[in-house]
Amino acid sequence: MEKICTLIIHTEIMKQVSQHKNTVQVYIIAIIAATGGLLFGFDTGVISGAIPFLQKDFGINDGIIELITTAGLVGAIAGALFCGKITDYLGRKKVILASAVIFAVGAVWSGLAPNPLNLILARLFLGIAIGVSSFAVPLYIAEISPTNIRGTLVSMFQLMVTLGVLVSYLSDLFFADETNISCWRPMFYAGVLPALILLIGMFCMPESPRWLMSKGFMQEAMLILRKIEGAETAEKVVHAINEEIEKNKNEISKWSELLKPTLRTPLFIAVGIMFFQQFVGINTVIYYSPKIFFMAGFDGAVSAIWAAVGVGVVNVTATLVSIYFIDKLGRRKLYFTGLTGIILSLVALSASFALVNELGYIGQWITVIFMFLYVAFFAISIGPLGWLIISEIFPQKVRGLGASVGSLSVWIFNSIVSFTFFKLVNALTISGSEIITDGEKAGNPAGAFGFYGLIALIALVWGYFYVPETKGISLEKIEDFWRKGGKPRKLK
């Protein structure tokens, strides 16, 4: 009897050790793949600190700066638009590897740009990799993750995006030199290093087992699933995936599939959540934070970049909090908590800018505090949730296309918000509320932040009806739920 008990205990211990090894391995895969998110964040955030020096070096106005900033986003639209089919055809891994090469070449080209037009073209090219990584990486991680920690692992993508933004701010700060207007060039060159890390790291990673099975590579998929899920669970996962493949085997993966009645709801959710993710205005802070801090009264490019670094630190910290809670509290609780905080923060920001000329030095720090809160509430909610949800809600047959549409949407909306920010600031500046700097009047962002706050309020109401609770539910069960015509808020 004693020997039997000892054997049972030993077997259980070995099982736990094996599960621990599997979990560690999955985390390593997710972290390396999520380096694509770090590059996404770096190459979108680096422009922020470069702007003051670019304007002096090339002698350009805010309109040209908006074009340079938006060029990367237009490239991202192209990347997201054309890579859905390619990802389903070639596989997730190969597409991520290709994006790493584009990231590296684009970083060098941006740093070498001799004029604004060349920089616009370089940013356009670089944007292709941003668009590709924005859907291929979360999709890859979602398909390779065990159900119980899928939310945590996919959210690592958003964590790495925020980390990339912070690294770009720190890089900007390191190279910033008020006496050297060309210091923006090495800011861009710094993006080569993480691109090489992604290229080398992903070369050693496995392909998505779900993609492999969809292409008939059953043995390879089974080997990967045994390593990341364990032998017992792998059998169940393979059975579930096979069932879905059988259901979809006579269907052709094409764009029109997304308009089928059973897929209209997940399509609407994907586009809707990405619309609200962008139109609460978060990327105006990511791209233009030094300019916004100038408006708040900060003096000098370096001091404004320091304040931007603070934004980056808050962004990363809050995303870490989100990752911890996303598979504990669930998607909906985080969504509603975050959106409520975003609304209150934007109202406070709008009020502080409306009184910026009267508040003076105190107003600067009120702006900083509520800017930090705004970023924090975004980072614990709709920031990571947008990317997570679009990677979960589509069936295997069209998951690449669905994630591509979600990613395409975010870049279109991002481009609109980024290209119109200064125009919106000027259009919504009430006469008499202009910001006075060195005796000159400039637009006041109070109205713009108020507008974004209104959008956030609409997002809160929309989320009650359309944000699904996917915590702890397998991708195959989510697919079956849509097939039965379920309503998003009833998914549990």
Where are these regions (language model features)?
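Short, well-structured alpha-helical segments
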Residues: 234-246, 307
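Short intracellular "coupling" helices and adjacent cytoplasmic loop segments at the cytosolic face
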Residues: 227-237, 250
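Alpha-helical transmembrane bundle of multi-pass membrane proteins
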Residues: 2, 10-226, 246-492
